[in-house]
Design a protein with these regions (language model features):
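A hydrophobic alpha-helical transmembrane-helix feature that marks the membrane cores
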Residues: 1-234
Length: 234
């Protein structure tokens, strides 16, 4: 009789742990997006702050910005508290770097791109979390396509073709739409394969928040270029 009583209890505990993990991961990812938006607004409305990214210092900031995701992911399981702080700092820096978009695109364009990105992200993250179908192959194909896209974008930096760049934006949206779903499923599975301890759960949640934040940011950037095709301030 005790065996029958314990089985439902273990299932309930597993569900509670998973729900707690998902709440932390998506909650921290959402907080990072919010901090980026606030940071972008303050920098965009303050010429003095925006000018801090001009000159040689911008290269230092750019290097730090590229290094942060690797540091956060590498330290998340060992030092989750430090990684959480670094994730939030990274979100603030990202928002500050993107504040210049306010000089290029109209407020309506930025808002449309943001709302569209949020809608696509929520739908695909939900799908990736609840679907029983394995998205590992989709994720691998999307990652390969992303590498090819990066190479093509570097080549187009020399060609400077606006049309090619515009087409790449649609490709980028497709890639990060797929990655959002596959990453959501992969991170859920990563938690389920862990020991479920508090430290492991928090560390994986931070890694997931960083990964999904990057998916959202890239989705936003590509949609911004699409919607901004005829709605820039130029």
């Amino acid at each position: 009789m005790n065996n029958y009583d314990e089985q439902p209890r273990r299932v309930v505990n597993a569900d509670v742990g998973l729900n707690s993990f998902l709440t932390k991961m998506y909650g921290w990812m959402g907080l990072a997006v919010l901090l980026s938006a606030v940071s972008a607004y303050f920098f965009a409305t303050s010429p003095a702050l925006m000018s801090s990214f001009a000159g040689p210092s911008r290269w230092i900031i750019l290097i730090v910005w590229f290094a942060f995701p690797f540091i956060v992911s590498g330290q998340a399981l060992k030092r989750p508290a430090l990684s959480f702080v670094l994730l939030m700092v990274y979100a603030l820096i990202t928002g500050a770097m993107f504040s210049g978009f306010a000089l290029i695109y109209t407020g309506a364009t930025i808002t449309t791109a943001f709302v569209s990105s949020a809608t696509v992200f929520i739908v695909m993250a939900l799908y990736g979390t609840v679907t029983k179908r394995s998205l590992a192959k989709v994720g691998a194909q999307a990652t390969a396509a992303l590498i090819a896209l990066i190479v093509a974008m570097v080549i187009n930096m020399f060609l400077q073709s606006p049309m090619i760049s515009y087409i790449f934006s649609f490709v980028g949206v497709i890639i990060f739409t797929a990655l959002t779903a596959s990453d959501s499923q992969k991170l859920k599975q990563l938690y389920l394969n862990s020991d479920g301890s508090g430290t492991a759960s928090t560390g994986i949640a931070i890694i997931g928040a960083m990964q999904l934040y990057l998916d959202f940011v890239n989705l936003f950037l590509f949609l911004l270029e699409i919607f901004g095709g005829g709605n820039s301030r130029n």
